[in-house]
Amino acid sequence: MTGTKIPFQTIDWSNISRTEHQDQTGVAYWQTIQLEGLRIRMVEYSKGYFADHWCEKGHIVHCLQGKVVNELKDGSKAILTSGMSYVISDDLSTHRSITDEGVILLIIDGD
């Protein structure tokens, strides 16, 4: 966040509208806060969610509720459950998300 100045603020997620994103199977619901150089999202993947694309973007991801499988293009997989996080840089480890039971994530990345 070098050079980005963000004054103290709170986020009341109940006041942030949700957008719906259809994927290969299931739906992703996003609540997004966009700041200069920073995107903060509360993301809910429905039961049976399978991302329709491989993502090359870097993120900080924290699992608030549920379980998600993060599949990397090299075939490896990492499972996040409530209270776990992962971090990844842009263009370093192409990945996608899959969940059978549904999950709620807090995702922070660049714009």
Give residue ranges: language-model regions.
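Conserved hydrophobic/aromatic beta-strand scaffold that supports enzyme active sites
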Residues: T32, I40-E44, I60, K77, ...
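Short histidine-centered beta-strand/loop micro-motifs
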Residues: F50-C55, E71-L72, S97-I98
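Conserved short histidine dyad/triad with adjacent acidic residue
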Residues: E36-C55, S89-L92
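Short acidic-glycine-tyrosine-enriched beta hairpin
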Residues: D74-D91
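Ligand-binding loop in jelly-roll beta-barrel domains
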Residues: D90-D111
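A short, N-terminal "cap"/entry segment at the start of jelly-roll beta-barrel domains
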Residues: M1-M42
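Short, conserved beta-strand element in jelly-roll/cupin
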Residues: Y45, W54-N70
